[in-house]
């Protein structure tokens, strides 16, 4: 209700894997604004993009949350799966046929599943948002069939599922922090990447 007397003054840290302009950071800052407003300014959440609290390492970022090094976090399930591999289920390709179906699952049984898995690691699940279905971009050629992926060096997040999928399709997957992707494509270290359109635009 925003009555400041009802809330203890406190500063919290929120770790985010995305860049400053990525939807992860935008959502995190909006969340921080809402908390500040509704606590009468007593609860301040400082948002740290690019996993700066963990030296740019997203795996360490989620580990810090689990041990209390960061108070809050906004991470993709493929990153959270470094804590609990069973969370990779949502990153399996072609699991959903539409945004509506994905939203319905995540808002009900899927969210309950996440909450249980994360609670076992000492993390409280507050909710979710999405970056959109993933789209492939690359600097070499159009990809319209699985065969077109053969030999392409594709950046993937640090996820066993993504590594396995792209290897199976004949690509050469490389795990890399998102903040390094644009430069890596320019330098030819990788040929491309796959993400939701909003994430790709943020590069």
Where in the sequence are the language-model features?
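Charged, often glycine-rich, active-site loop that binds/positions anionic groups
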Residues: 54-66
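Extracytoplasmic "Venus flytrap"
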Residues: 13-30, 50-55, 200
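A structural preference for short, hydrophobic beta-strand core positions in alpha/beta folds
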Residues: 45-49, 175
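Short, polar/charged alpha-helical segment
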Residues: 21-46, 70, 160, 164
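Short, low-complexity disordered leader/linker segments with a strong preference
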Residues: 1-11
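Contiguous mixed-secondary-structure segments that line small-molecule binding/active-site clefts
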Residues: 33, 63-66, 71, 76-172, ...
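Pocket-lining segment of extracytoplasmic ligand-binding domains
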Residues: 161-163, 172-203
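Residues at or immediately flanking beta-strands
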Residues: 11, 42-46, 153
């Amino acid at each position: 209700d925003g009555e400041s007397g009802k809330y203890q003054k406190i500063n919290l840290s929120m770790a985010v894997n995305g860049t400053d302009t990525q939807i992860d950071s935008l959502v995190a800052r909006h969340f921080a604004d809402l908390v500040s407003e509704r606590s009468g300014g007593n609860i301040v959440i400082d948002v740290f993009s690019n996993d700066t609290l963990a030296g740019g390492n997203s795996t360490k970022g989620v580990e810090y949350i689990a041990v209390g090094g960061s108070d809050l976090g906004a991470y993709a399930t493929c990153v959270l799966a470094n804590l609990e591999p069973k969370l990779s289920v949502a990153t399996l390709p072609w699991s959903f046929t539409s945004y509506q179906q994905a939203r319905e699952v995540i808002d009900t049984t899927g969210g309950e599943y996440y909450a249980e898995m994360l609670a076992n690691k000492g993390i409280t699940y507050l909710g979710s948002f999405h970056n959109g279905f993933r789209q492939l971009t690359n600097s070499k050629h159009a990809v319209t069939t699985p065969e077109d992926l053969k030999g392409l060096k594709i950046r993937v997040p640090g996820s066993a599922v993504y590594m396995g999928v792209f290897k199976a399709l004949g690509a050469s997957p490389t795990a890399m922090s998102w903040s390094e992707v644009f430069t890596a494509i320019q330098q030819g270290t990788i040929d491309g990447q796959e993400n939701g359109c909003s994430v790709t635009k943020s590069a």
